Amino acid sequence: MSFTVAIVGRPNVGKSTLFNRLVGKKLALVDDTPGVTRDRRPGDARLMGLTFTIIDTAGLEEADAESLQGRMRAQTEAAIDEADLSLFVVDAKSGLTPVDTDLAEMLRRRGKPVVLVANKSEARGSDSGFYDAYTLGLGEPTPISAEHGQGMLDLRDAIVAAIGEDRAYPEKEDVAVTDVDIPQSSDEGDEDEEPIYDDTKPLRVAIVGRPNAGKSTLINRFLGEDRLLTGPEAGITRDSISVEWDWRGRTIKMFDTAGMRRKARVIEKLEKLSVADALRAIRFAETVVIVFDATIPFEKQDLQIVDLVLREGRAAVLAFNKWDMIEDRQAVLADLREKTDRLLPQARGIRAVPISGQTGWGLDKLMQAIIDTDKVWNKRISTARLNRWLETQQVQHPPPAVSGRRIKLKYMTQVKARPPAFMISCTRSDALPESYTRYLINGLRADFDMPSVPIRIHFRSPDNPFEGKKRRT
């Protein structure tokens, strides 16, 4: 992207609505409640031939530096310093407030280009607020309606005028396309070849867990900066925020998510939106780290989150956070491992790593567990090896007999990876008990070293060409 733009303004003037309009997706949560956005969120904006990086920010308010609102303000000011240009959004419908005046003064002191945007200009009675915006001393306001998409051409022209045509439209260079991602090995390929794991591709990782488990603190420690809001208050994170960083030469894209509580406790509409956003992050990720509070682990909600991640087909890693607060670490670790095996039988062999997001202890081991788990999630096994294995499994533990006739497993192949899924051709597939399926899944985990990822097996009976036809008498 050629330049970076920060959207700033007081709460509830329509910043996130404008952000979603510019990126062409509903990435940021939008609600009538003031202060929905808390962290700064970057995105790729496209505006009538103009491309740039856009940053959505929290509403600016006067607040004590140590308060939640004060920490939100610090995040927004960091976005302003990072950006080349600020879109200062005011509400033309409700008019100016003293906060708008203070923000205008703060932006002037920064000395960077500012485009004054009068949002909600389609509303009846907005003319007064539009003309009042001139008094801020930031030039002519650009009237728009972020909700309805009106005034976007004028907004583009104002951005180009503020940033300069050379920055807005840099000369395009002929660049060979080398980063097109066409994943073939995950769903198709030579059945007799087992593809080599590609450790150069960016890895998408979602960080999930109960409120106040330390998810944002963990990501900040990875990044080495206070990129995300943290604090003692539960439920600080609302949007799923993505950040990128490099680990041993590999790009990692991490998604911080809102804390997930039990459904019965989720009453507010805004929290429901936040949880839905977290679910989307899980589905978009490749590997999901479920963060447990090691001081109070294995709450019912922890187990439900793990089950949800596995049902979505994601690779899963457990992180027992706040390890710096544990005294008898050896005894606690042994207890946690015993409970993991007992309470999460569907995740047999799942990698569990004790960490401290506060001090950074154990984070290298956690990252290695994430990479190792992703390798398993992408694993493919040749058809020849699978059928030799299937024959051995049936010798050791034959399938049960149904109505006096034993079920025969004839052929096995892997139909996809991410997560690994297999198809077995057999007789009477509808009569095969669940216990035998579990036996095969556990065998695959043990014999092909496939812990911590969901494994799917589909059984199929060959079509009977004579089914439905009358027998001759």
From Swiss-Prot:
InterPro entries tied to this protein: G_ENGA (IPR031166), GTP-bd (IPR006073), GTPase_Der (IPR016484), KH_dom-like (IPR032859), KH_dom-like_a/b (IPR015946), P-loop_NTPase (IPR027417), Small_GTP-bd (IPR005225)
Transmembrane regions: none
Residues bound to GTP 2: 209-216, 256-260, 321-324
KH-like domain boundaries: 379-463
Keyword Repeat in record: yes
Record-annotated EngA-type G domain positions: 3-167, 203-378
Sites where the protein binds GTP 1: 9-16, 56-60, 119-122
The family this protein is said to belong to: Belongs to the TRAFAC class TrmE-Era-EngA-EngB-Septin-like GTPase superfamily. EngA (Der) GTPase family.
PANTHER family assigned to the protein according to its UniProt record, in alphabetical order: GTPASE DER (PTHR43834:SF6)
Name of this protein: GTPase Der
Encoding gene, per UniProt annotation: der
